[in-house]
């Protein structure tokens, strides 16, 4: 089973430790997803998890 179903459901569970919602990621990284949700500007380091959720404040 593909651990990242963002393309289908808009929700991505990465390694069971992080959830990325409202995004269009196509694959997952260990830290979370290789995308930032809408409203979260993309940063040089990508989308960084704060806690167990990637949200509009995920980018540092």
UniProtKB/Swiss-Prot annotation:
Gene3D superfamilies for the chain: Metallothionein Isoform II
Family annotation (Pfam families): Metallothio (PF00131)
MF annotations from Gene Ontology: metal ion binding
Positions annotated to bind a divalent metal cation 7: 49, 54, 58-59
Keywords: Metal-binding, Metal-thiolate cluster
First and last residue of the signal peptide: none
Residues annotated as binding a divalent metal cation 4: 32-33, 43, 47
PANTHER family named in the record: METALLOTHIONEIN, METALLOTHIONEIN-1X
Full protein name: Metallothionein
Organism: Oreochromis aureus
Gene, per the UniProt record: mt
